[in-house]
UniProtKB/Swiss-Prot annotation:
Name of a matching Pfam family: Ribosomal_L10
One GO CC term, this protein: ribonucleoprotein complex
Subunit composition and interactions: Part of the ribosomal stalk of the 50S ribosomal subunit. The N-terminus interacts with L11 and the large rRNA to form the base of the stalk. The C-terminus forms an elongated spine to which L12 dimers bind in a sequential fashion forming a multimeric L10(L12)X complex.
Matching PANTHER family: 39S RIBOSOMAL PROTEIN L10, MITOCHONDRIAL (PTHR11560)
Family listed: Belongs to the universal ribosomal protein uL10 family.
Function: Forms part of the ribosomal stalk, playing a central role in the interaction of the ribosome with GTP-bound translation factors.
GO terms (BP aspect): translation
Alphabetical list of NCBIfam families matching this protein: PRK00099.1-1 (NF000955)
Molecular function via GO: large ribosomal subunit rRNA binding
Keywords of the record: Ribonucleoprotein, Ribosomal protein, RNA-binding, rRNA-binding
Keyword Ribosomal protein: yes
Protein's name in the database: Large ribosomal subunit protein uL10
Native species: Anaeromyxobacter dehalogenans (strain 2CP-C)
Length: 174
């Protein structure tokens, strides 16, 4: 790779690192091409970048970005996973991926400007994602309206039952 290509890679990585809400630094050892391709596809479908990076280029690209505090963890084989919207989805996808693979290790992460260790990423993976949270919030907003409709309708239903029971009682009496 010549100097121009390196500068281009640094510029591209810097731009992505600056936009990232979550950046996870991982160590992808002993993974075959098919497994990595499958992981890349899952991450790409979720609009998450997965890059195997040259450590010196990544460290230079990290300068002046939210990823800079973890640049010292760019040692050995390094994969960089970056998300620009949702911070939970990359953690969930990587935690799911790691269940079957001991070789893939999360070193550290930056989540919305905060340094998080591997345990923190695992804990984040257990939280509901953005879509699930939106669904829960919508259900919570709709719930009071549903309860109110039931409460408003209940007295009328009870009155109708009382009138119906009294009507049946009078018919039996004759």
């Amino acid at each position: 790779m010549n100097r121009t290509e390196k500068e281009q890679v640094i510029g591209e990585l810097h731009e992505k690192m600056a936009k990232a809400k979550a950046a996870i630094v991982a160590e992808p050892k002993g993974l075959n091409v098919a497994v990595v391709t499958d992981l890349r596809k899952k991450l790409r479908d979720a609009k998450i970048d997965y890059r195997i990076v040259k450590n010196t280029l990544a460290a230079r690209a990290a300068k002046g970005t939210p990823v800079e505090p973890v640049a010292d963890r760019f040692v050995g084989p390094t994969a960089l996973v970056m998300s620009y919207d949702d911070v939970v989805t990359p953690a969930k996808l990587l935690a799911d991926f790691m269940k079957d693979r001991e070789n893939f290790v999360i070193r550290t992460a930056i989540i919305e400007g905060k340094v998080v260790d591997a345990k923190g990423v695992q804990a984040l993976a257990k939280l509901p994602g953005l879509k699930e949270l939106r669904g829960q919030i919508a259900a919570m907003i709709a719930q009071p309206a549903t309860k109110l409709a039931r409460l408003v309708g209940t007295p009328g239903q009870q009155l109708a039952r009382v009138v119906g029971a009294r009507h049946e009682q009078l018919e039996k009496q004759g």
